Amino acid sequence: MNEARARIIINLRLSMDSLMRVFSHRSPPPSFGFACDVGAHPSSTAQNLPMTYGSVREMIDDFSIVFGVPKYRTSKPKKVTRKFSFTRLLQPIDNLVTCPACSNIHPSDTICDACYAKVHQLTSEIKKKMMQYNPYVGEKQDKEVYVKFRGEPDAPAAVVKGKRVLEIEKERPTWFKKLTLKE
């Protein structure tokens, strides 16, 4: 019964709105809201029941927020104008520096691409050697690693103690930091 009364009030409100639109030639006025008690007390059963609609129009009016999408597609030229408008001018990059090692230009807050490629190649080589020993462990190895390049003297036993020695068949690059050989 409460739902029937609520439905009647909603239908009455919608018909009043449509009548006001017909008789007024200006913009539509704000919709009327009835302040009345639909039930004696708020019933929990009315809230649990699924909403039933008398027509498709009532359903559309109730869910009008769902249809808040653009009516027409934005054309391709309009999108391109937004993207490449004259207001979007090119900005100069002012944080470029020259790499002291290889003379390449790069942003001041990053490492040079050419230098990074050299470091990446050497570390990849070291990782491959580590994985040849025990490929099932993955990145986390069971022992620490001491890297020995060709032409280097043997490290003291105290430095190598408990570590796996990886021998690389190339000279140590000048930029590759030597580990301290203190006991």
From Swiss-Prot:
| One cellular-component annotation, GO | mitochondrial large ribosomal subunit
Q: Which UniProt keywords apply?
A: Metal-binding, Mitochondrion, Ribonucleoprotein, Ribosomal protein, Transit peptide, Zinc
Task: Tell me, in one coarse class, where this protein mainly resides.
Answer: mitochondrion
- Family, as annotated: Belongs to the bacterial ribosomal protein bL32 family.
Q: Which GO terms describe its biological process?
A: translation
This one is known as Large ribosomal subunit protein bL32m
Oligomer status and interactors: Component of the mitochondrial large ribosomal subunit (mt-LSU).
Tell me the residue numbers annotated for binding Zn(2+): C99, C102, C112, C115
Name the source's superkingdom.
Answer: Eukaryota
Where does it localize? Mitochondrion
* Species of the source: Caenorhabditis elegans
UniProt GO MF annotations: metal ion binding; structural constituent of ribosome
Give the intrachain disulfide bonds. Answer: none
- Physiological role: Component of the mitochondrial large ribosomal subunit (mt-LSU). The mitochondrial ribosome (mitoribosome) is a large ribonucleoprotein complex responsible for the synthesis of proteins inside mitochondria.
